[in-house]
Curated annotation (Swiss-Prot):
Species per Swiss-Prot/TrEMBL record: Lysinibacillus sphaericus (strain C3-41)
Cofactor: Mn(2+)
Enzyme class: hydrolase
Keyword Chaperone listed: no
Name this polypeptide is given: Adenine deaminase
Length: 581
């Protein structure tokens, strides 16, 4: 095995034509993401590194392939994703996305960290190391997301410190608890300070923040935001020195709204991310390739869109060895025939072809899952009394209204059906009962609320994918189906369950922390299709992504009204409120 010094020497010699290269991709239309031009060249690779772009056919290699004039772009980079939201392990996630041209992702494992703490982070790192894709980790900053709910773990600065110098760790993940930052809460500032001292990147989470609050985030050293929903917000972030990662996921779709913010003078401060995207959409669409194609369809030049998806994101996360097709950079590149679709014909990682025509060319590997992460659901036996939502004064209530395909909700104050002092769900008014039950430590705390907008005509839906604390979450038209759904969630140790008229219509077990499956992606996709089909039976007019929208109604850091296991939470005032208004 050659040493790093020997490899460096070989790379230099190979760049001068004095040593045979490992691989040459000939006759490529190479994307220059610095000058935003195309140039015809042969890409010369040694030891996984591009050592030359040859214009005169003067290099030789052990292996040669002809691009036949096709476009070749740098491997695409996702700047912010929670791999757990794909419901796949990192290794299987990698196998889904590499064929789409994604060769690097920056992940925040705060979903599994909220369930299993530091051990959850370690599992993600271990599994990521077995992936063909480069998976870099941002250390979860907000576990739990707030102090107003019960998660499976609490991560202090001391808990994160052992991970700071891990080769796959790039920084501190999205800082969601903005009052903790702006009020100078010591625990949060210690995490930020540790990251700054290690010269790591600090991600933001600036949902709904005003410009002066962004100033406070910047003063703390927070460098990115992926929560912009308007062009004006994006411009403000960039003007205050941030990188903006444009999000296009399964529920949050902000790309079209944010594109007007990108101009020639500020484009280098933008990148793409998915944040949360389900396995079926990842398999069908990909992720960042889809964003690039959409941006091109909306009028952005192909090279500009490719720049956002490669070098911009690489530089944001100080990955200065990738994102560019030039000597000295990683040999991560993608062969593309049609820029309008961005469909990858072949993908190379570190100079090795790892995917072709949508299929992986390598075998699947995976890390061992710790036993208690496989058994993480501990629910109490639920009864009608457990789900009774009482009113003392009248019928006026604080009601959560979902916004289809968005993470935000509206806060309504309206009259609701009440019979003998107890809320009664109404299909006609689309007012359903919502419950969050603590499932980590046998605390049995239960938050109850009322939600409008899901449109269920019957039945109930339950899950343990309830961002970010991932307690058990259930919505329904009646208590009996809600109780059955929760009981089944306990039996399968997490996942999704859909029930109607006392019958289980569909389920998807997620036995790894109640968040991820250990089955291959294709099988997971089929299970997810079963859930979508069952949802159509509960709501025949359903026209939005129910499951992902549903999974965020318990996240008390995104406005306006959310439900946790400790009760209804007003994100605007950052405090609990009563359901009865």
């Amino acid at each position: 095995m050659t040493t790093k010094l020997q490899q460096l020497t070989q790379n230099i010699l190979s760049s001068q034509g004095k040593l045979e290269a490992d691989f040459i991709l000939k006759n490529a239309q190479v994307a220059d993401v610095y000058t935003l031009t195309w140039r015809k060249a042969d890409i010369v690779v040694k030891n996984g590194t591009i050592v030359a772009l040859d214009h005169s056919n003067r290099f030789h290699a052990k292996e040669v392939e002809d691009a036949a004039g096709s476009y070749v772009i740098p491997g695409l980079i996702d700047g912010h994703i929670h791999i757990e939201s794909s419901m796949l392990t990192p290794g299987e996630f990698s196998r889904v996305l590499i064929p789409h041209g994604i060769t690097t992702v920056i992940t925040d494992p705060h979903e599994i960290a909220n369930v299993a703490g530091a051990e959850g982070i370690q599992f993600m790192l271990d599994d990521a190391q077995k992936a063909d894709m480069d998976i870099f980790v941002m250390l979860p900053s907000s576990v739990p997301g707030t102090q107003f709910e019960n998660a499976g773990a609490t991560l202090t600065a001391q808990d994160l410190e052992p991970f700071l110098h891990h080769e796959q760790v790039r920084g501190l993940a999205e800082v969601m608890d903005f009052p903790a930052v702006l009020n100078g809460e010591e625990g949060m500032l210690q995490k930020i300070l540790l990251s700054k001292e290690a010269n790591l990147v600090i991600d933001g989470h600036c949902a709904g923040l005003q410009s002066e609050q962004i100033t406070g985030y910047r003063a703390a050293g927070i460098q990115t935001d992926h929560e912009c929903v308007t062009a004006e917000e994006a411009i403000d972030r960039v003007e205050q020195g941030m990188y903006v990662l444009i999000r296009e996921g399964s529920a949050a779709k902000n790309l079209r709204d944010l594109l007007p913010a990108i101009q020639s003078h500020n484009a280098r401060r933008f990148g793409f991310c998915t944040d949360d995207k389900y396995v079926d959409e990842l398999m069908d669409e990909g992720s960042i390739n889809y964003d690039v194609a959409m941006a091109i369809a909306e009028g952005m030049t192909p090279l500009q869109a490719i720049q956002l998806a490669t070098v911009n994101t690489a530089e944001c996360y100080r990955l200065f060895d990738r994102g560019v097709l030039a000597p000295g950079y990683k040999a991560d590149f993608v062969l593309v025939d049609d820029l309008s679709t961005m469909q990858a014909k072949a993908v190379w990682k570190n100079g090795h072809k790892v995917a072709e025509n949508g299929e992986m060319l390598t075998s699947r590997q995976e890390a061992k899952v710790p036993a208690h992460i496989h058994h993480s659901v501990h629910l109490p036996s639920m009864t009608k009394d457990s789900l009774q939502l009482s009113f003392k004064k009248g019928t006026r209530a604080n009601v959560m209204e979902i916004v289809p395909n968005q993470l935000i909700t509206n806060h309504l104050v309206i009259d609701v059906p009440v019979k003998e002092g107890v809320f009664v769900p109404s299909i006609e008014q689309d007012l359903l009962k919502l419950a969050v039950i603590e499932r980590h430590h046998h605390l049995h705390t239960t938050g109850l609320g009322i939600v409008k907008g899901f449109g269920l005509q019957k039945g109930a839906v339950a899950t343990t994918v309830a961002h970010d604390s991932h307690n058990a979450l259930v919505v329904g038209t009646n208590d009996e189906d809600m109780i059955l759904a929760l009981s089944r969630i306990q039996e399968i140790q997490g996942g999704f369950v859909i029930v109607a008229d006392g019958e289980i219509l569909a389920e998807m077990p997620l036995t790894i922390g109640g968040l991820m499956t250990d089955v291959p992606a294709q099988q997971a996709k089929e299970q997810l299709a079963g859930l979508h089909n069952a949802l159509q039976k509960l709501n025949p007019t359903l026209d939005f992504h129910f499951l992902l929208t549903f999974s965020f109604v318990a996240l008390p850091v995104i406005p306006a009204l959310k439900l946790t296991d400790t009760g209804l939470f007003d994100v605007t005032t950052f405090q609990h409120i009563e359901v009865e208004a």
